[in-house]
């Protein structure tokens, strides 16, 4: 399994760069356009919720039909609460609902100093 590591500022100025990298990685695995877009949206939304201060590590593990993405450390506890708490109300659009729609699985891992890591997995459809 190949692995790619990236450290990026959380600043909004770098989100387009991250989107480009995520798209390139998914394209390498022959993901369909909508699958590429889904993975880009998941990472983008997660970074938007994380604020703009500091930096974050993003690692990508590339399988034959999947990308596992690990994002952190994130200091925004509201992310963990949104992903691990009760389901959103009908019609409420939050991070959890977005991730449930665009990735195949996600999870939250606790790290040192109260930070968290979020794990995302996107599978390529069989063709």
Describe each model-derived feature in a short phrase:
Residues 1-4, 49-127:
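Conserved beta-strand-loop-beta-strand hairpin that lines the nucleotide-binding pocket
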Residues 2-30:
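Helix-loop-beta hinge of the Bergerat
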Residues 29-57:
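Conserved ATP-binding N-box helix of the HATPase_c
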């Amino acid at each position: 399994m190949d692995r790619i590591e990236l450290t990026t500022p959380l600043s909004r100025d770098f989100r387009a760069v991250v989107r480009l990298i995520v798209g390139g990685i998914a394209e390498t695995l022959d993901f369909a356009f909508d699958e590429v877009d889904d993975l880009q949206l998941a990472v983008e939304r997660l970074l938007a919720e994380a604020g703009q201060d500091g930096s974050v590590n993003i690692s990508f593990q590339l399988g034959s039909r999947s990308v596992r993405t690990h994002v952190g450390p994130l200091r925004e506890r509201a992310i963990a609460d949104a992903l691990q708490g009760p389901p959103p109300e009908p019609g409420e659009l939050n991070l959890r609902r977005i991730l449930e729609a665009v990735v195949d699985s996600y999870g939250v891992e606790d790290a040192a100093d109260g930070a968290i890591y979020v794990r995302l997995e996107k599978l390529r459809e069989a063709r």
